[in-house]
Amino acid sequence: MSRRRSVSSQENDERLLEAALAEIVEVGVDRLGMSGVARRAGLTTGALYGRYENVNELAAAVWTARVRDAHFQFLDRVIHALVDGDPSASLAGIARELSSPSAVTIAALELLAMARRIDELEEVVTPDVESWLTRWRVGPRVRDRRRRAQALFALGAVWGVILHAMPKARPVEWEPMFARTTRSFAQPYDEPGDRFVAEAAGAVRANVGDASQNALIDSVSAIAARVGFDRATASRIARRANLTSGAIYARYETKSELLSQAVEVLLAQRLADDLVANTYLFTAPDVGRATASVIGGYLSAPRRDWRIFRVEAQLAARHHAELAATLDRVQEAAIRAYLEALGANSAEEHRALDALARFAQAIPLGLAFVDLVAPAVSTTDWRAVFVPLLAPEPF
């Protein structure tokens, strides 16, 4: 027979969970420590170890007791509003959460992303996500493939907007973009008779003119994609590049400087190359179909490590000022280039199209995040989303 726990013991349970949630938001899952949580809660580490064997078990408890239900309720509202067009699910409320995400939302993205590489988290997060996807008919075996594509896109939109703003938040009017998305989802759509073909896409590799530097940058990408930025040690990066740790410090004063350059080189290079390669989309006879093919290529297997690298970079930017500054600079430069490609030359035109440019950058980022947590995303026929979304709106 189990002993009844005292009221003070139960109150300490709550204090520790609240403290752990706050620590995850402040320092991230990778730097979550028992001593930091205990200090924040005003308790001893013994109080923590009496409840949780290790910090990963604590993170799993935060997901189950503090984050899961609240975040899934938010995602419920997203599907109701964007996919089902339910007027009771306020787009304005969703836009407010995206502009100023709650602690629970920030922690949810951290925990969802880390579950793929932390066993204790994976054991609770993966079944919970699968259950939610099944409940909303978003699993890989559903018959309504258009609805599944719409739901995955909706998830990518909200997660992408949040991730994109992590280096530096800026005021953006998101509600019109989501209203346009909802209207497009309600448009009639005839499923094409031909098979969806994703655009061919290769792996992203550094090309800075120095073989050793290229090797180091590519090694950062591979290691960070596997273990995250905080756990990407200099020795491991050097070993994968077939170099010594001294080769890193001969070129960079700190490991952080190397990580930031890797982000700048690989992300700026990819965004610039993609803009040049995809400029034809602005005048394509069927822009929706062409865009769907590009997105399919972006979500293909050769780009997977690079996609994970970018997601890890966005999350780490919340805790690393140098990385945040680099990411923000790269993203803003890409947005300016995109606006110029659209023909926006004046400051007024830039302001008018700013939300569109940010949405266009946030969507692929968000879909990369969806691909981390949902099965069979790469098999999605994205024409079901982009053909109606990019078609001229009926008057």
Name the predicted role of every residue range.
Residues 5-12, 204-215:
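Short, Lys/Arg-enriched anionic-surface-contact patches
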Residues 72-105, 274-307:
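Hydrophobic alpha-helical connector segments
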